[in-house]
């Protein structure tokens, strides 16, 4: 029987290993995602973000880093989390079903050249999948943060989209990597805007 201290230590060790494994495959696609976002934002586009549960919190976290700041002062950047308007979410969910709570907002707010960030640890969240389909209808780019094998989301992405798939089976480790990816993207964007990298 393990002690609570051993369990906590095991979480740290597994989290470190998961990040190291993800880092082996996700550095280049993360840079691609940041460059795609920069291109969108510099052309007066916007970024929409969505997810469920912890992924909804990540979508909101990302939007806050864009509209406010990450670590350094810079201009405000156009990003909206589609997870925050309870009136829209409940009205759409009630009238059209939960699978459409994000896609209806994407169709209302998204324009060609904008970006949808879809976050799903399983890669199989039906409402995120519908949002991606809606984004493609609007000629938007998609940046998908997924886990495990990428799920159904990986299969519907276009060549012009970016897949950031964390190859780990545990939801907690995937979520920890997703927030790391979000922070890395924010840092890349700030580095280009503030330092001309």
UniProtKB/Swiss-Prot annotation:
Cofactor note text: Binds 1 zinc ion per subunit.
Catalytic activity entry: 2 D-sedoheptulose 7-phosphate = D-glycero-alpha-D-manno-heptose 7-phosphate + D-glycero-beta-D-manno-heptose 7-phosphate
Cofactor(s) listed in the protein's UniProt record: Zn(2+)
Main location: cytoplasm
CDD domains named in the record: SIS_GmhA
One GO location term (cellular component): cytoplasm
Enzyme Commission number: 5.3.1.28
Binding site residues for substrate: 52-54, 65, 94-95, 120-122, 125, 175
One biological process term in Gene Ontology: D-glycero-D-manno-heptose 7-phosphate biosynthetic process
Molecular function, one GO term: zinc ion binding
Binding of Zn(2+), residues: 61, 65, 175, 183
Residue ranges annotated for the SIS domain, each copy included: 37-197
Record InterPro entries: GmhA/DiaA (IPR035461), Phosphoheptose_Isoase (IPR004515), SIS_dom (IPR001347), SIS_dom_sf (IPR046348), SIS_GmhA/DiaA_subfam (IPR050099)
This protein's pathway: Carbohydrate biosynthesis; D-glycero-D-manno-heptose 7-phosphate biosynthesis; D-glycero-alpha-D-manno-heptose 7-phosphate and D-glycero-beta-D-manno-heptose 7-phosphate from sedoheptulose 7-phosphate: step 1/1
Stored Pfam families: SIS_2
Cellular localisation: Cytoplasm
Keywords on record: Carbohydrate metabolism, Cytoplasm, Isomerase, Metal-binding, Zinc
NCBIfam families the UniProt entry points to: gmhA, PRK13936.1
Quaternary data: Homotetramer.
UniProt similarity note: Belongs to the SIS family. GmhA subfamily.
Miscellaneous: The reaction produces a racemic mixture of D-glycero-alpha-D-manno-heptose 7-phosphate and D-glycero-beta-D-manno-heptose 7-phosphate.
Function: Catalyzes the isomerization of sedoheptulose 7-phosphate in D-glycero-D-manno-heptose 7-phosphate.
Protein name: Phosphoheptose isomerase
């Amino acid at each position: 029987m393990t002690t609570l201290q051993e369990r906590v230590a095991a979480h740290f060790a597994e989290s470190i290993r998961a990040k190291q494994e993800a880092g082996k495959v996700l550095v280049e696609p993360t840079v691609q995602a940041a460059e795609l976002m920069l291109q969108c934002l510099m052309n007066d586009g916007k970024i929409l973000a969505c997810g469920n549960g912890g992924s909804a919190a990540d979508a909101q976290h990302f939007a806050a880093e864009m509209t406010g700041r990450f670590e350094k002062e810079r201009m405000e950047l156009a990003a909206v989390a589609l997870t925050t308007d309870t009136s829209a979410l409940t009205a759409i969910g009630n009238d059209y079903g939960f699978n459409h709570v994000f896609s209806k907002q994407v169709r209302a707010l998204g324009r060609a050249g904008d970006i949808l960030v879809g976050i799903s640890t399983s890669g199989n969240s039906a409402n995120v999948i519908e949002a991606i389909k809606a984004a493609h209808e609007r000629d938007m780019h998609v940046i998908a943060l997924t886990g495990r094998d990428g799920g159904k989301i990986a299969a519907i992405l276009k060549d012009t989209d970016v897949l950031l798939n964390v190859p780990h089976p545990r939801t907690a480790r995937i979520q920890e990597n997703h927030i790391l990816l979000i922070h890395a993207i924010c840092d890349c964007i700030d580095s280009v805007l503030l330092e001309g990298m």
